[in-house]
């Protein structure tokens, strides 16, 4: 068995409770709405150097289902976990990219877009459009959280050359929804594409040892363990060392 790198110590800035969440973005981030073919997508952007690459943080699936298992009317995330990571990234060009229908309400949106069709070609294409509008011809590093990890993988497989994606980072990432729904007995995502082929680009996958939402072994089944960093005692949205991620 290949050696898995386990981080045993945490330095400085650890996100361990909701009390540490930022309610307001830093002054150097601006809220920008991006219009694509089918959606208006919410972003928070810090662009300081037109000649540098862009790091784009792609949100997870958000609040897709309520506690009774029914689709919600608003999939906006309840947690600011990924936003906080993006806001603490000191790189010159950093963007937090929400998923379709998050933060922006519309009667025209269909809950299929954040439930069984959350990784459909329609979603994939619109997210790729947004990334292109954000980055233009700049190189891109995609950082996907939870279900956003799978979406990033699909985008890389379909649009890597067009979008100049040079690296893929995942945090508590879902990399195969078929295995995930089967394991938990969830409704299959029948209108979604799956990540049947892992992108062949430089990549790092941060997984929480105690993640009960997306167990780390599910991620380790999908990718080379040499590209995985198992964070001891980390859960799905707690215990990750932000500095390790943003400085990757």
Model-assigned labels for residue ranges:
Residues 173, 178-238:
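The feature captures the conserved acid-bearing segment of alpha/beta-hydrolase catalytic domains
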Residues 239-248:
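Post-His helix in hydrolase/transferase enzymes
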Residues 143-152:
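Gly/Ala-rich beta-loop-alpha elbow adjacent to hydrolase catalytic centers
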Residues 36-42, 46-98, 103-104:
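Short, surface-exposed "cap/lid" segments of acyl-processing enzymes
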Residues 109-135:
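Alpha/beta-hydrolase active-site loop
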Residues 154-166:
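Conserved hydrolase catalytic core segment
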